[in-house]
Amino acid sequence: VFLSSIIACDRILVFLLLAGVLEYSIASFTRFIDIGQKITDHRTPEVFNNQLRKMYWQQVLLLFATSALAFVFIYYIINAPWGFQGQFKETLVRLSIKVSVIGGIGYVLLAWGMLNSLYLFTLGLTLKPLKAIIYACIINISLGFVLSRFFAYEYSVVGMLCGAGVFTILTLRANINYFKSL
């Protein structure tokens, strides 16, 4: 139980680091839209649309770069001599590390879905992210519950990963469709 709570703290750390990236991303997106609407010539809206798409993918790249840095940081916390084993005098079992990695990937997908949702909310499309989060929660709870009860408790993280994946896919699709229709 103690090891599980430490690993959960690592996953929360990943998510909190990514939340800062989300805050930066939506602030720069809003600023871009405000400035872009003022300076874009009405005869060349495709230039604005292309810049908007480019900025979105730059924000996704920033999210992944931050995620990679967070994973490296957590890897050192787990494996460095001054890290987990040095502080708690216990070694982490492979299962705990596996659950942590799967959970971390799930949190990255969740953060990407949240970035997509922030874009959609900013653009006035509120229903699509709400539907996506409802579907994701249903998948997370049902799949996580079934796997954890009938196979092993650690498989509940697979439900979270799948739910986050569905959330990301649905919100990404909504963003791409919006960008295509600009």
Model feature map: region roles:
Residues 58-73, 156-178:
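Short alpha-helical transmembrane segments in multi-pass integral membrane proteins
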Residues 71-103, 108:
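Interfacial segments at transmembrane-helix termini and the short loops linking adjacent helices
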